[in-house]
Amino acid sequence: HKIDYFVDSGTLLGAVRHGGFIPWDDDLDIAIRREDLPRLRKALQEELPSDMCYQDWTTEENYPMTIAKVRDKHSIFDESYYRMLKERGIYIDIFFVEPSLPLWLRKPIDYVYIRCIRGMNKFSDRFIEIFLGYLCYPITILIVDLVRLWGKLFHVKKLGRQYGWKSSLYVNENVIFPVSEIQYEGHKFYA
């Protein structure tokens, strides 16, 4: 499908430090360019075996994250954060990188975005959090869409995590792309 992916986060740390898993990280993490998400979503929804599923905010009403997951349907990974979801099996996290504002401008946007998502997705029984979630979410999405448009129009070459995720990632595009190979549990993956 010609989608550049690379191991990321704890998986990348484990590959560099241990050649594989690290004891305190219980999943696999990969990342892609956000612009590749629609193609990846379509490919995974059409081609995953029946015992696995693709999961994100477009496939599950109460999905509480701005990252995607590929889950095993025949397992249960009991995390309180995900108890309201239909599928809760073990998973691979799929993060996104996209053109980014400098961190000092991003942090307030991410903070509000995260609070809105949590308020809207039944993470709180407090009426005020739920109300503010629904009130501020459309405004936050508009701001994020404008920032993404700005990144495209001005060909921003600094990449950060997807909006709505606490992150300190803010690097030049050429630090990540083109991807290279790294050993992980005896296999080669892109990093």
Model-found features: residue ranges?
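Conserved catalytic core of two-metal-ion nucleotidyltransferases
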Residues: H1-D4, L44-P102, K122-D125, E129-Y190
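Short hydrophobic/aromatic beta-strand micro-patches
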Residues: A31-R33
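Conserved aromatic-histidine-acidic binding/catalytic patches
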Residues: L28-D29, H187
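Active-site nucleotide-donor binding segment shared across nucleotidyl transfer reactions
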Residues: H1-L28, L37, N174
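Short, conserved charged micro-motifs
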Residues: P38-K42
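A short secondary-structure junction signal
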Residues: L103-I109
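Alpha-helical structural motif
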Residues: D36, Y190-A191
